Amino acid sequence: MSDLSHIRNFSIIAHIDHGKSTLADRFIQMCGGLAEREMEAQVLDSMDLERERGITIKAHSVTLYYKAKDGVTYQLNFIDTPGHVDFTYEVSRSLAACEGALLVVDAGQGVEAQSVANCYTAIEQGLEVMPVLNKIDLPQAEPDRVKDEIEKIIGIDATDAVTCSAKTGLGVDEVLERLVATIPAPIGNIEDPLQALIIDSWFDNYLGVVSLVRVRHGRVKKGDKILVKSTGKVHLVDSVGVFNPKHTATADLKAGEVGFIIASIKDIHGAPVGDTLTLSSTPDVPVLPGFKRIQPQVYAGLFPVSSDDFEDFREALQKLTLNDSSLQYTPESSDALGFGFRCGFLGMLHMEIIQERLEREYDLDLITTAPTVIFELVLKTGETIYVDNPSKLPDVSSIEDMREPIVRANILVPQEHLGNVITLCIEKRGVQVDMLFLGNQVQVTYDLPMNEVVLDFFDRLKSTSRGYASLDYHFDRYQSANLVKLDVLINGDKVDALALIVHRDNSHFKGRQLTEKMKELIPRQMFDVAIQAAIGGQIVARTTVKALRKNVLAKCYGGDVSRKKKLLEKQKAGKKRMKQVGNVEIPQEAFLAVLRLE
């Protein structure tokens, strides 16, 4: 389709479970993208993991042809985006390739914090945002209240927002008509030299790197020589095409279109996301503005259970980083766990997903250590360093000041659950910044230590508000705090993988909890196992896993007390000897115990 005015590029913004993948299914069905027998729920969520958890993790793209009521056939390039707070990076990438976005809001639930955050990202990038109310068939749907909320909270006019039900298909054609009318056509020139933005790329064992691109100017076809701007390497194009939703090869990709390019790039860093592609004959085409690199918020050590898997693990991480560029990793070694990698994630869900993808897609067995955030330390020498691993913390005597990262959290919550949410924030050492009453909802803004947020704040928030509160947060600053390193000693030996950095006020409590938890998880040995929590040289908590022992007095019956004493002393000496040479195996659950501290 050569006419730019007949192309519409858009993505869907919505909170988790507001029905964007279902709406995508309806679009595909109405535009005849798949035969009836191939239709299945959530066609675009291709990863098994996405289907099981019912969430979208990766952004997916589809090209559909829609014949509008005015008789014109439009090409719709549609990019499905994730809704979870950990995957905002995927969303900002998808938005960079579009001219417009559909803001899908559940007509029963109303506006949630995550859609607000993504909507602002879209408006900042200059996109046309079109509100759509979904799930209008539900008995609890209140379209008027929700339209009012969209105007109050986000500030876009929603008086004549389209209403539909993606599940039943009601009003979906109306959404498509409105979309074609409101979302602007792309601007670009087919005659100009090629300029294309890489939105996403992944590694295929047969084809090499497959890149999803948005062509801004010019055209690209099979047999062209393309130049990757950041690496300066030239590759020959094997094929170009679009997803509708299957791989479909086309003659070429032109300005304004979204599609894939395969150029048998074998190096996994050969086509980085956010990079610009052009033809090798026009190397001086300006670079397109990419997306801002996102800094990981949470760090954890990942170690293969068997050290023979280390090389496979490294390769798996490299392939995964291509597909998920927000993942960062550096090699690390631990006395307790051997060789592995210190990985940076965007949040806890992201960490779980990555671990599951590594275990499933690459068949690895992994152990994860407790996640931590980055701390800023000012040393007595005046030097500032950043520490993402408690076991790498320098000696306390050399530290002038320890600072922890603070996040600015926006929480949207119905008024009846406000009290519980405030109690939770205070318990997590939060400081209230602002509170706004918007209709039935309240928007509270808190400054919270990131250390408290990353572990279980999201789950606790959902449970105290019966699932109604929603959260969006971003890093704000570093702030001085009274922090200490809590070490765990097992039989007097420090286990580096179990160390934590905690606030001094909580340290005794955390130490007690941790030792109690470890006592349940470490199996009983033939000798007593002492589990201690220490801050520096001071032991703050201790529990003992009692030894298994044989009853050596069973054969004595009424015998003499000195005989009994002799047998008991002999047993004691044996246990003492065992303790000196014995090693304690720590099970994987024990490393994760740190996560489950309330």
Swiss-Prot record:
Record-given protein name: Elongation factor 4
NCBIfam families named in the record: lepA, small_GTP
Superkingdom of origin: Bacteria
GO function terms (MF aspect): GTP binding; GTPase activity; guanosine tetraphosphate binding; ribosome binding; translation elongation factor activity
Lineage of producing organism: Bacteria, Pseudomonadati, Pseudomonadota, Gammaproteobacteria, Pseudomonadales
InterPro entries assigned to the protein according to its UniProt record, in alphabetical order: EF-4, EFG_III/V, EFG_V-like, EFTu-like_2, LepA_C_sf, LepA_CTD, LepA_IV, P-loop_NTPase
Name of the gene this protein is made from: lepA
Sections of the chain in a coiled coil: none
EC number: 3.6.5.n1
Naturally occurring in which organism (per UniProt): Pseudomonas fluorescens (strain Pf0-1)
UniProt keyword annotation of Hydrolase present: yes
Enzymatic class: hydrolase
